[in-house]
């Protein structure tokens, strides 16, 4: 099998980015909201739900970038496979959030290209240091995503049943991903790194909700 050159890998990543940012996405599992009926939402409630789901969509864009960036420089084939598998599972979440945004008459964040490639760069730097650090980033990322999901579940309008079902399933999946990464040897990140990640997350959620 021919070893991919740097240019080959760049083209491969550009192709992957184009595929999962193109609507409609095709998840491997149907949306958890498929059999759920919404209550009546006011325009204000619909706008708020759309803002929350836009944040969650962008969070999944960041996860794709981080995991693919880590996988691109992973030290071992096992780590590379683990990360690409995690990215594939997160793709379903991306598709579910994208579908829900369309139902709410909203669009994804205009800043998603920036967040994807910024996350890809962070992932590549972490992955180039060690696989243990790479898994540590996965653990911390999933924990932060779970906090967002928990707050969004509490903030969703009472009648937004479809969004709620999606976020509940995402929370379960993210929890499993964090446990798997810890078992794979994820190292505990320094407090400074965690603080920077939280700050980046705060900026992302604030901007994605509005734009």
Swiss-Prot record:
EC nos: 1.14.99.60
GO annotation terms (biological process): ubiquinone biosynthetic process
Recorded superkingdom: Bacteria
Cofactor: Fe cation
Chief location bin: membrane
Cofactor note (record): Binds 2 iron ions per subunit.
Protein residues bound to Fe cation 2: 90, 142, 174, 177
Disulfide bonds: none
Coiled coil: none
Pathway connected to this protein: Cofactor biosynthesis; ubiquinone biosynthesis
Subcellular location: Cell membrane
One GO CC term on file: plasma membrane
Membrane topology: Peripheral membrane protein
Pfam families according to UniProt: COQ7
Residues that bind Fe cation 1: 60, 90, 93, 174
Signal peptide as annotated in the record: none
Listed GO MF terms: 3-demethoxyubiquinol 3-hydroxylase activity; metal ion binding
Family of the protein in this entry: Belongs to the COQ7 family.
Name under which the protein is recorded: 3-demethoxyubiquinol 3-hydroxylase
Lineage of source species: Bacteria, Pseudomonadati, Pseudomonadota, Gammaproteobacteria, Thiotrichales
Gene that this sequence comes from: coq7
């Amino acid at each position: 099998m021919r070893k991919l050159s740097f240019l080959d890998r760049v083209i491969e990543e550009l192709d992957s980015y184009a595929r999962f940012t193109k609507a409609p996405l095709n998840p491997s599992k149907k949306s958890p909201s498929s059999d759920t009926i919404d209550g009546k939402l006011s325009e204000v409630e619909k706008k708020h739900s759309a803002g929350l789901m836009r944040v969650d969509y962008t969070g999944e864009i960041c996860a794709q970038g981080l995991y693919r960036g880590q996988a691109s420089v992973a030290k071992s084939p096992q780590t590379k496979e683990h990360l690409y598998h995690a990215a594939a599972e997160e793709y379903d979440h991306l598709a579910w959030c994208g579908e829900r945004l369309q139902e709410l008459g909203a669009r994804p964040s205009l800043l998603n290209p920036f967040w994807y490639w910024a996350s890809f760069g962070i992932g590549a730097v972490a992955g180039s240091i060690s696989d243990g650090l790479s898994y540590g980033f996965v653990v911390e990322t999933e924990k932060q995503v779970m906090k967002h999901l928990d707050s969004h579940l509490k903030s969703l309008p009472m009648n937004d049943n479809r969004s709620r079902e999606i976020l509940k399933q995402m929370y379960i999946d993210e929890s499993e991903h964090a446990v798997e990464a810890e078992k794979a040897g994820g190292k505990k990140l320094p407090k400074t790194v965690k603080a920077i990640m939280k700050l980046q997350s705060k900026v992302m959620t604030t901007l994605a909700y509005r734009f």
